[in-house]
Amino acid sequence: MKKLLFFILIPFLGIAQDFTANGINYTITSRTAPFTISVTDNPNFTGAAEIPETVAYNGNRYIVTAITRGAFMHCNNLTSVTIPNSVTTIRENAFADCPDLTSVTIPNSVTSIGDRAFSGCTGLISVTIPNSVTDIENGAFAGCSGLTSVTIPNSVTTIRENAFADCSGLTSVTIPNSVTSIGDYVFGGCSGLTSVTIPNSATTIGDGAFQDCSGLTSVTIPNSVTTIGNFAFERCSGLTSVTIPNS
């Protein structure tokens, strides 16, 4: 029984809260120079979260480098987030299901946005992904039904499964020339999407990538594409014109 208890406790040690500053909880990730911390669980946080680059604690100044898994998940009254230039990683579910979140600033220091990081943020209207990000992970912005505009930089090479699925407010998307792979169901359920630009760099369009995009009227698939997945354009009831390349 003691052994079982030991293994149950281990997962919780990684998300322990070490201290709170200005209403935000942090966990220490390095106690030696350079001193670093991550933003950890903040249940029931309300209002605007302004995360600083550094935080003083016990005589040391700590650099904020990451926002941990589920840090603000289900914070129904979180309205905006400012992420500092010191942060490189936003982990999975970090801001998932925050319906009142309308504004987020993601700095150029961020290289990784985790799975479902902003999924279910129905109040989010626009997102600019910085040019430091190379992959948009699984379901990163899925279910953001209020999202009308997204800027994808030329640094992105892969858009993974469900990244923008069910973003029903999204009307137009330009996929940059750097992208080589459009994952499964990436824009599935984006019923408001009327136009999409697929770049000459893309070689693969995944299963169901544009499934249920009922507002889509035309699409041109470039010669670079060699694989179009199953159901890629299924139930696109408004689609009247498709150009498929010889490739």
Q: Residue ranges of each PLM-predicted region?
A:
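Intrinsically disordered, low-complexity boundary segments flanking structured domains
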Residues: I8, Q17, I37-V39, D115, ...
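Boundary at the C-terminal end of the N-terminal hydrophobic targeting segment
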Residues: A16-G23
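Secondary-structure transition/turn motif
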Residues: R31-G47
